[in-house]
Regions:
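A short glycine-rich beta-strand->turn/loop micro-motif centered on a GG-aromatic cluster
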Residues: 128, 150-164, 206-211
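Conserved NTP phosphate-binding and transfer environment spanning the P-loop NTPase/kinase superfamily
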Residues: 269-276, 280-339
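Short, positively charged low-complexity motifs
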Residues: 1-2, 13-14
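Positively charged, proline/Ser/Thr-rich regional signature most characteristic
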Residues: 50-122
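Glycine-rich phosphate-binding P-loop
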Residues: 180-199
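Flexible, polar/low-complexity N-terminal or interdomain linker segments that lie immediately upstream
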Residues: 26-71, 99, 167-175, 179-183
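Conserved nucleotide-sensing/catalytic segment adjacent to the nucleotide-binding pocket
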Residues: 205-269
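Catalytic cysteine-centered active loop of the rhodanese-like fold, especially the PTP/DSP P-loop
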Residues: 102-156
Length: 339
């Protein structure tokens, strides 16, 4: 028979062997956890002018990145659009466990390819990584980079945190900015004047450049697509963030829309309320300037005719027919004067 253990005399009870092993395992796990701890940055730190990051990496799919992204970021998707759709379908329609396994295979493969592009980076290289909301996609990439030894940082809340900052901060930036508006009819060189003002060292906000559009039915830029509404607002926010609010900002007058882009209501109202400088020149000179500036339309007359016909509800059948005749006869100066 085994002898009875001595009676309890007070003090700490001796730990059972299996409890000692369990505590040892937990201690080692905590140590590993501490070693793997990844730094997390708030959106305010990321947007600061002295942000300490060498690269900003967006690991979302290409279509998500194209819609909008943090300024200066590069797209290294851990799942492309097709893969993301495939994993999402598995998760919703088949089995979340199967979806996670499939996702792990795809993500691991893609991360390996991306890491190879950074193989020459020094150990001091500091990347910031984000996904949609700071979840599994960005954490997966960050964990691998962290284990390699790079001082990687995650954006808390991901792109959603950034978009919220845009929505909350843009109107206040607009209200805090003094605008001087350049007004005048089409063809009098407002955009050129704005560029000259910038060359003289003054602050300028070129909305048409941000929107990739010249602001009229004929204003689409050749071989350029307009950004999404979200990306335009990101560009606007980034431009205003770098403005010295103690000095005025020169801006060209615009309607409430530039192509498919809607100006924020507060910005449009600020343009209405701001001080204005009116410019003008002779009608013939404006027509000649327009023909030169919109030369891509004279080179693709079929496209120009299609655009002109979109104005029929505003100008009537007879006027449209006259403009179409100008196009057919390549009377571009007459068309510009009439428009």
């Amino acid at each position: 028979m085994n002898p009875r253990p001595p009676p309890y005399q007070g003090g700490a009870l001796p730990a059972e062997p299996h409890l000692q092993r369990s505590r040892s395992i937990m201690k080692r796990a905590r140590q590993v956890n501490m070693q793997r701890k990844i730094e997390v940055a708030e959106i305010e730190e990321v947007l600061s002018t002295d942000r300490p990051f060498d690269s900003i990496i967006d690991v979302r799919s290409p279509s998500e990145f194209a819609e909008d992204h943090l300024p200066g970021s590069i797209n290294l998707p851990v799942l492309d659009d097709v893969e993301r759709s495939e994993v999402g379908t598995l998760f919703k329609q088949i089995d979340p466990f199967i979806a996670r396994k499939k996702g792990a295979v795809l993500i691991s493969h893609n991360i390996a390819k991306h890491i190879d592009t950074f193989i020459e980076k020094s150990k001091d290289w500091r990347p910031l990584i984000y996904c949609w909301r700071g979840g599994q996609r960005s954490t997966s990439m960050a964990l691998v980079m962290h284990e390699i030894g790079w001082p990687v940082t995650l954006l808390r809340g991901g792109y959603k945190a950034y978009r919220k900052e845009i929505q909350n901060g843009l109107n206040q930036m607009i209200l805090n900015t003094e605008f001087i508006v350049i007004t005048g009819p089409t063809g009098c060189g407002k955009t050129d004047l704005l560029a000259e003002i910038a060359r003289k060292g003054q602050q300028v906000l070129d909305l048409e450049a941000l929107a990739c559009h010249r602001g009229s039915i004929l204003g689409a830029e050749p071989e350029k697509n307009q950004p999404s509404q979200k990306l335009f607002e990101t560009r606007l926010y980034d431009a205003l963030r770098n403005v010295d609010q103690t000095k005025p900002v020169f801006i060209e007058s615009e309607s409430s829309k530039i192509g498919d882009i809607h100006l924020p209501k507060q910005l449009f109202q600020s343009l209405i309320d701001a001080r204005a400088i009116a410019v003008d020149c002779e009608r013939a000179k404006r027509a000649q300037y327009s023909v030169e500036r919109y030369s891509h339309l004279t080179e693709a007359s079929e496209n120009t005719e299609s655009l002109i016909k979109q104005l029929r509800f505003r100008h009537g059948k007879r006027q449209i027919e006259e403009w179409v005749q100008f196009i057919a006869k390549k009377q571009w100066t007459e068309l510009a004067e009439s428009l």
